[in-house]
Design a protein with these regions (language model features):
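Active-site beta-loop-alpha junctions enriched in small/polar residues
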Residues: 21-23, 53-55, 81-85, 123-126, ...
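Conserved short secondary-structure transition element at the edge of the structured enzyme core
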Residues: 143, 235-293
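Glycine/proline-rich, positively charged
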Residues: 89-183, 187, 198
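Short, well-ordered coil/turn segments that N-cap beta-strands
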Residues: 11-16, 46-48, 72-76, 115-119, ...
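A short acidic, helix-capping loop that chelates divalent metal ions and anchors anionic groups
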Residues: 22-27, 85-92, 284
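N-terminal binding-site loop/beta-alpha segment at the start of enzyme catalytic domains
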Residues: 1-77, 327
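Glycine-rich, positively charged active-site loop/lid region within alpha/beta enzyme cores that binds
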Residues: 90-93, 193-249, 269-273, 316-328
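Conserved, mostly hydrophobic/aromatic
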Residues: 6, 18, 35, 50, ...
Length: 328
């Protein structure tokens, strides 16, 4: 497994990470046993950058990850997030970036993960009611006392990133980036590169759409949250599916999978970008790991660009309510 440094932070992570969200929620049924086996296999393969959050499964995902790494903590870089608040029944209750909440959330995450220190601690969504300087100030105190090693932001605007960086070094920005979500190329990527901040790309497989695994909406279970996403809607599904055909063709010519092409494309966008595809199954993890062996020629990249120009996907990447919480 290759390594990459997150910006100029000094934090070295595997070039490919593992998003753990779907092991607890959102993407249909999951098995804890299989999920833990997937995490263990990831570590064995050198995929040691693990990503979770306190809101995934209302804390259950952190507990799952903590259990999986209990006897191999020194082999992983552990990232979690705070700030997206949920009630005891899983209801979404907005965001909270107040200093008191920051510190309380960290304590709860440390307990659930059963660790003494979190390697990378992100603010999951920016709280528009609290100046980012106050939130990051509280986060920096967690670094001072040794509960957190590095700080990160998620789905923050360029202006917010700049303000945050003046308070404490930001190691990473985590934001969606893939062939069908390229908004960050306008302002976000140039900003983090200017400031020496690493970029962690979540949903690099377009929430699974770019894998070529879906042919109709019926392929999504009734409990799958993607049914509520505009790009998976009846209105947009067919046109988005047509975009994936070029990826299929390139993959077939190289004797690899569409997933591997999609991940290789993200990896090719810069050594400072680390994609964290999520999966709860060993076979998909292994498939994703092999994307690092895929080399895209200039011709391949040109074909991909022609098929997936900026803004090619139909529909917004989140439902309206969730879109309101990004890039602020």
């Amino acid at each position: 497994m290759q390594d990459r440094e997150l910006g100029n932070s000094g934090l070295i992570v595997s070039a490919l990470g593992l998003g753990c969200m779907g092991m607890s929620e959102f993407y249909g049924e999951a098995s804890d046993t299989e999920s833990i086996a997937t995490i263990h296999r990831a570590i064995d393969l050198g995929v040691t950058f693990l990503d979770t959050a306190d809101m995934y499964g209302v804390g259950a995902n952190e507990e799952l990850v903590g259990s999986a790494i209990a006897d191999r903590r020194d082999r992983v870089v552990l990232a979690t997030k705070f700030g997206s608040v949920r009630g005891p029944q899983g209801e979404f209750m907005g965001v909270d970036g107040t200093p008191a909440y920051v510190k309380a959330a960290c304590e709860r995450s440390l307990v659930r993960l059963d660790v003494e220190t979190i390697d990378l601690y992100y603010q999951h969504r920016v709280d528009p009611k609290v100046p980012i300087e106050e939130t990051v100030g509280a986060m920096s105190e967690l670094v001072t006392v040794g509960k957190v090693r590095y700080l990160g932001l998620s789905e923050a605007s360029a202006a917010t990133i700049r303000k945050a960086s003046e308070i404490h070094p930001i190691a990473a920005l985590q934001t969606e980036y893939s062939l069908w979500t390229r908004d960050v190329e306008d302002e976000i990527l140039p900003t983090v590169r200017e400031l020496g901040i690493g970029f962690v790309a979540y949903s690099p497989l377009g929430r699974g759409f770019l894998t070529g695994a879906f042919s109709t909406r019926a392929d999504l279970s009734e409990t799958d949250a993607r049914r509520n996403h505009p790009r998976f809607s009846d209105e947009h599904f067919a046109s988005n599916l047509a975009l994936v055909e070029t990826v299929r063709e390139i993959a077939k010519a190289k004797n690899v999978t569409p997933s591997q092409i999609a991940l290789a494309w993200v990896l090719s966008r810069g050594e400072d970008i680390v994609p964290i595809p999520g999966t709860k199954r060993v076979r998909y993890l292994e498939e994703n790991a092999h994307s690092l062996e895929v080399s895209l020629s200039e011709d391949d990249l040109a074909k991909i660009e022609a098929a997936f120009p900026y803004g090619a996907a139909a529909g917004t990447r989140y439902p309206e309510a969730s879109m309101a919480a990004v890039n602020r």
